[in-house]
Each structure stands twice: as C-alpha cells, then as structure tokens.
C-alpha cells in the first residue's frame, strides 16, 4: 500500500463575499471527497491580514496555493471545476500515479 502524502493548502479570499464563500465551499467538497484526512487548509482573508497577502505576493482573490508537497502551485479565480483544480495543483496526476502503482503490484 502506498503511503498517502499530506497536502498543505492556503486559500486567499477577500471577505465573506458570495464568490469567496463559493470558492471555499467548492474547495472543501473537493478536499473531503478526494483527500479526506490527508490535507490541511488555511483560509486567509486578505482584508483582515493584508500582510500575509503581501508576503505571499497574492494579487487577486480567490487564490488557492498548494504549499506541500512541492512544487508550490497556484490557481487564481474560479475553483468550481473539480478537474481543473486538481490538474492545476498537480493533484490529479499524483492520485492517478498512486492508484496505478498500488493496482499494478497485484498478480
């Protein structure tokens, strides 16, 4: 059995706007379905913590950043398409690779 990686993600939003809440809800659904128990998500409101947005060079919201495992990946804007989110963060490839390796060892 292949050990699952832990994913560290940051979601940058601008307040409790409908767009921010939609991004958060969609992302939580994707993470719970695909990565239950192996992810940590930090939500950063750039209106309340602008210094964090500045440090991480965030120019638009919503922005989703995958911090770990490397490499760092970002998606800016619409997070409603599950497959685009997974591909954009290099997570779909990781999951396909792990299932191939675990499935390919049986005789």
From Swiss-Prot:
Leader sequence segment: none
Single GO BP term: circadian rhythm
Coiled coil: none
InterPro entries documented for this protein: Circ_KaiB, KaiB-like, KaiB_domain, Thioredoxin-like_sf
Transmembrane segments: none
Entry-linked CDD domains: KaiB_like
Name of a matching Pfam family: KaiB
SUPFAM superfamilies: Thioredoxin-like
Keyword annotations of the record: Biological rhythms
Function text: Component of the KaiBC clock protein complex, which constitutes the main circadian regulator in cyanobacteria; it may modify the ATPase activity of KaiC.
Family in the record: Belongs to the KaiB family.
Subunit structure: May undergo a major conformational rearrangment; in the free state forms homooligomers. When bound to KaiC switches to a monomeric thioredoxin-fold (KaiB(fs)). The active oscillator complex is probably KaiC(6):KaiB(6).
Misc. remarks from the entry: The kiaA gene has been eliminated from Prochlorococcus during genome streamlining. It has been suggested that the central oscillator in Prochlorococcus does not have to be as robust as in other cyanobacteria because the former live in specific niches of the Earth's oceans; they divide exactly once a day and at the same time. Thus gene loss and changes in kaiB function compared to other cyanobacteria, can occur.
HAMAP family named in the record: KaiB
Description of its domains: Has 2 forms, fold switches to a thioredoxin-like fold (KaiB(fs)) when bound to KaiC.
Protein name: Circadian clock oscillator protein KaiB
Species whose genome carries this gene: Prochlorococcus marinus subsp. pastoris (strain CCMP1986 / NIES-2087 / MED4)
